[in-house]
Amino acid sequence: AASDVYKRQVIFRGMSNWQTGEHFMRKYTEDEKFMKEAIKQAKKAEAIGDVPIGCVIVHDGKVIARGYNKRNKDKTVLAHAELLAMKKACKKLGDWRLEDCTMYITLEPCQMCAGAIVQARVTRVVIGSMNAKAGCGGSILNLLEMQEFNHQVQVERGVLQEECSEMLSAFFRKLREIQKEKKRKRKQMQEE
């Protein structure tokens, strides 16, 4: 119904070039499908004790690269999911430009990753969860769509937001519980 189309448009405000509800629905389903792939990558990060952030890059309707956060494992700030996926995509395409590619990220990119996305000329970015503390895709800054740059990225926000947000929240809840337990044990040892 028309009201359903309107509701989806409200959820994904800022979306342009949607001409019909049918077109919108087809695109939404495709975005959801690829965001699920990014979520699978995020779960790999969680399995190695890293913050669960995942990314996939799609070209011509096919996933050409995947990445997940390995910052803690690799002990480098450069091991963000987006950068790892971009490196693979560039190698696969044989070019540093990722034109005609869509990147699906479970968490809004930081300033480093947003800058790399713009520099690589990624056409479109689909974000799961926004990042109020470090997001540069619209939360704190919007580097992706800045008119001052020579390239702007089309951005869709909130695709599978609940699932992406809950995965991160659960990870940090668990981390806080572990830290509390360690603190409790240290205190107990000091008292003995």
Functional labels for PLM-detected ranges:
Residues 19-48, 112-192:
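Zinc-dependent deaminase
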Residues 1-6:
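Short, small-residue-biased leader/transition segments that mark boundaries at the very start
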Residues 73-83:
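A short, polar/charged loop-to-alpha-helix boundary motif
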Residues 78-79, 87-120, 124:
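Helix-adjacent hinge/juxtasegments
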Residues 53-61:
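Short beta-strand scaffold segments in enzyme catalytic cores
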